[in-house]
């Protein structure tokens, strides 16, 4: 029933979305294509395009039962997409090495619809705060937390990753991101964001992530490699993701 309801809600949201939002999504994709084609763009315009694109994309994918908007590594070939997502999230949680999971308060950078935060909080028994640029996804995350009676432990906020994080220093017992940080920052911007994540973490705690990188077999001198890479990035609304493994 949950899957049917999710698909129905996604269809309803798509049908009722204002035409300007749909147009903004298409224009955002075209913008990202031009950017990968070599057009000079600003961080501000890139960020606006990402928000406009994901506002529609998250509802489209929910129709097909994909609410966690990431492709996990294949940790177990016997498991499907969802099963490997759970394994990936379990591995991230283990990497954070929480001292007292039930009393922990974690930060989910780029939380999307809040499904990962929900699963992490279910495993720890503690709290998770989610931060995301798209108000539509944050609204969905808040609704899901309320529906599952997790509102007291799941907290969501709309915010721009490129700005200082709207949290006090030393607040969190751990931080994680799932394909939601590295693809959207230029190399020189990653250091600034890393400093912000470091600022809001308690001393001695960890940041864990699952991010996609270029494999050692990628060849920048191979035109086919480069062409496929640049044509793929706009589909994810990724601005960069050009970092070697």
Region spans (language model):
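Short, glycine-/aromatic-enriched active-site segment of Class I SAM-dependent methyltransferases
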Residues: 209-237
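A short glycine-rich, Lys/Arg-flanked "PGG" loop and its adjoining helix->strand segment in the class I
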Residues: 191-206
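A short acidic, Gly/Pro-enriched loop at the edge of an enzyme's catalytic core
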Residues: 163-175
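N-terminal auxiliary segments of SAM/dcSAM-dependent transferases
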Residues: 1-63
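Conserved alpha-helix/loop element of class I SAM-dependent methyltransferases that forms part
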Residues: 79-102
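Class I SAM-dependent methyltransferase SAM/SAH-binding core
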Residues: 105-107, 117-163
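A short SAM/SAH-binding and catalytic strip from SAM-dependent methyltransferases
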Residues: 173-188
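Class I SAM-dependent methyltransferase "Motif I" SAM/SAH-binding loop
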Residues: 110-114
């Amino acid at each position: 029933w949950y899957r049917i309801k999710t698909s129905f809600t996604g269809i309803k949201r798509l049908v009722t979305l204002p035409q300007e939002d749909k147009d903004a999504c298409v224009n955002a994709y075209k913008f990202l294509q031009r950017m990968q084609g070599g057009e000079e763009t600003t961080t501000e315009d890139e960020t606006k395009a990402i928000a406009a694109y994901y506002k529609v994309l998250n509802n489209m994918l929910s129709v097909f039962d994909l609410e966690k908007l990431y492709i996990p590594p294949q940790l177990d070939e016997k498991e499907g997409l969802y099963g490997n997502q759970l394994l990936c999230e379990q591995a991230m949680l283990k990497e954070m090495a929480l001292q007292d999971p039930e009393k922990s308060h974690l930060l989910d950078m780029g939380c999307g619809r809040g499904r990962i935060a929900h699963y992490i909080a279910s495993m720890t028994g503690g709290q998770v705060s989610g931060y995301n640029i798209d108000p539509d996804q944050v609204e969905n995350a808040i609704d899901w937390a309320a529906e599952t009676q997790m509102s007291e432990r799941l907290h969501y906020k709309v915010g721009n990753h490129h700005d200082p994080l709207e949290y006090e220093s030393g607040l969190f017992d751990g931080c994680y991101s799932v394909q939601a940080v590295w693809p959207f920052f230029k190399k020189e911007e990653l250091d600034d964001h890393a400093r912000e994540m470091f600022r809001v973490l308690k001393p001695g705690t960890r940041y864990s992530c699952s991010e996609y990188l270029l494999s050692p077999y990628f060849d920048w001198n191979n035109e086919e490699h480069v062409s496929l890479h640049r044509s793929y990035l706009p589909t994810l609304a990724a601005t960069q993701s050009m970092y070697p493994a």
